[in-house]
Swiss-Prot record:
Keywords, in A-Z order: Calcium channel impairing toxin, Disulfide bond, Ion channel impairing toxin, Knottin, Neurotoxin, Potassium channel impairing toxin, Secreted, Toxin, Voltage-gated calcium channel impairing toxin, Voltage-gated potassium channel impairing toxin
One Gene Ontology CC term in the entry: extracellular region
Family label: Belongs to the neurotoxin 10 (Hwtx-1) family. 19 (HpTX2) subfamily.
Subcellular compartments: Secreted
Protein's job: Inhibitor of voltage-gated potassium channels of the Kv4/KCND family. Blocks calcium channels (Cav).
Database matches in InterPro entries: Huwentoxin-1
Protein name: Kappa-sparatoxin-Hv1d
Domain notes: The presence of a 'disulfide through disulfide knot' structurally defines this protein as a knottin.
Disulfide bond entries: 3-17, 10-22, 16-26
Domain of life assignment: Eukaryota
């Protein structure tokens, strides 16, 4: 998943949707 590579602290899709910035990325990814 791109989240882990683009945003540090987001190791998985689940973590992606938890963090603020990561959550924004998750929304755009969907």
């Amino acid at each position: 998943d791109d989240c882990g590579g683009l945003f540090s602290g987001c190791d998985s899709n689940a973590d992606c949707c938890e963090g603020y910035v990561c959550r924004l990325w998750c929304k755009y990814k969907l």
